[in-house]
Amino acid sequence: MAKVRIYQLAKELGMETQELLELLDQMGVAYKSHASTLEEKDAEAVRELVKEQRGLQEKLAEEERRKSLPRRPPVVVIMGHVDHGKTTLLDYLRKSRIAEKEAGGITQHVGAFEVKTPQGTVVFIDTPGHEAFTTIRQRGAKVADIAVIVIAADDGIMPQTEEAIAHAKAAGAKLIFAINKIDLPQADPEKVKRQLMERGFVPEEYGGDAIVIPISAKTGQGVQDLLEMILLLAELEDYRADPNAEPRGVILESKLDKQAGIIANMLVQEGTFRVGDYVVAGEAYGRIRAMMDADGNQRKEAGPGSAVQVLGFQELPHAGDVVEWVPDLEAAKEIAEERKEERKAREEEEKARRPRTMAELLRAMQEEGRKELNLILRADTQGSLEAIQHILARESTEDVKINILLAQVGAPTESDVLLAQTANAAILAFGVNPPGSVKKKAEEKGVLLKTFRIIYDLVDEVRNMVKGQREPQYKEEVLGQAEVRAIFRLPTGKQVAGCMVTQGRIPRNAEVRVLRDGQVIWQGRIASLKRFKEDVREVAQGYECGIGLDGFDDFREGDVIEAFQMVEVPA
């Protein structure tokens, strides 16, 4: 940009001229009047400062605006090992006999419902397993604020418990641990707490920050404490939403009903949806014909935190699809079609660039600016697993941290693939063969899945790739010094220093710095190095030479020219 007058810049920035003059005073920029001309660099500095100040003001204003919004209920997902009491807890919470209706007490479908207490409302999402929860997260939707991990007091932490924890953490949910079945004679809550501490979750009663609540979903003991803790955590996190914003929600589940047609279970996150609204969710679109809550009550509108069933989609939306309000049917159709085309193009692109080696995975990780290498480990025995973990724990570097999301005995599962896709992780299997369906799933999702028969083959591959990914470390190596003893000026006006090399050597291609009274006054490169008017590549200690520098013309007798180079430190 060219020079600009102060009053012109004020107009450009939408400021009063006096306001800009005051800003220039603060910046120490000299001027005579509002008609004075600013140098290009000063004008650009003003633009940047004003932009920064306005950005900060907007951020503060947005924070203040959010604080003035009404609170929304926390959204909670209940996860854990099969038969540890997830459905029984949900059943107790909503006071319906769902646990008896469902086969074997295992949840069959995703549901969402509200629990109203004197302290506030909590929205519970019921997933058939953490796979569905992770699938929702993969589609970019932050659904649950809090994950309650249910652990049976008699069984303790099981493989599915660890998977549930890993999936909840990958989804960015806050964790609460509910130790269930404390009414049983064989219950051992302290054992569960010890197991949690072994995994880095220290309960609050022992000085940590892990929230652990003992409960009995069967009798209801401790369930009120759990609800109070959920609401306390929600108050600390300060969940808020704007009921007047443009409506937005997320699909939890969809199904085709013989009588009603397509039914979508939706959680409203912002704004208020109303019957008659046109909506688009992923590649599906439609007009809301009816909304019902979890109890089957008809709703004309649904605001933030509401969980409702929606009728009116033309085709099945997917779990995790974001539901958006659109002005009319034509816009809904157009957006859905565009997304179909975008998906096809994206699938082709992803197919072409799926990581097939650890190096490719690391390269992708570096391009994203991540500093962690996420791994899922599977092994044939607990001993092998512990040995691999123990060795890998020492292989993290300052540049790349090895982060083991999940480590379990047994072959990789489809659940592992979903977690790996969500967290951009690699699955490394030792001494176990993944089933064909898992290999196929990994190929479809672009997840790196590798098997090993020798522990050190696995460790060496990770070690070499991490080392190859580290930022190179350099140290300075001084090559030599030359003392300026005479100064000559060429016909071109440029100075040349007549020097004596007093230490080491001065190479022609080295970087140099000029020292005066021990202080660095300039740093750059040599423009010319001569002996008796002949260009030379290098001058050794004890010899005289003439040195011209690229961009420096202020030599004084007694100055020292020091040559140096940066040398990479071996890994």
From Swiss-Prot:
Region (G3): 126-129
Superkingdom as given in the UniProt entry: Bacteria
Residues that hold GTP according to the record: 80-87, 126-130, 180-183
Region of interest (G4), ranges: 180-183
Database matches in Gene3D superfamilies: 1.10.10.2480, P-loop containing nucleotide triphosphate hydrolases, Translation factors, Translation initiation factor IF- 2, domain 3
GO cellular component, one term: cytosol
Record's subcellular location: Cytoplasm
GO molecular function term, any single one: translation initiation factor activity
The keyword Cytoplasm is assigned to this record: yes
Function: One of the essential components for the initiation of protein synthesis. Protects formylmethionyl-tRNA from spontaneous hydrolysis and promotes its binding to the 30S ribosomal subunits. Also involved in the hydrolysis of GTP during the formation of the 70S ribosomal complex.
Name used for this protein in its record: Translation initiation factor IF-2
Source species of the chain: Thermus thermophilus (strain ATCC 27634 / DSM 579 / HB8)
